Amino acid sequence: MRITKDNIHEFIEGTTINCNNIGVIHIEYIPDHIKNLYCSDNKLTSLPKLPDGLIRLNCYS
């Protein structure tokens, strides 16, 4: 699964993106208002530019 500008809204709740363990291989874009990013247990090899205000990043396998 690829997370793009077109479908990222499906994973956003408030200021959090949660896409843990859903087979994500690529995240194209992270909006500037995001404070928490949870993307563990996927097949990511890199992340896009992270927002300056990001507080929490959980991205492990």
Where are these regions (language model features)?
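Concave beta-strand-loop units of leucine-rich repeat
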Residues: 17-24, 33-45, 53-61
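N-terminal capping/linker segments that flank leucine-rich repeat
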Residues: 1-34
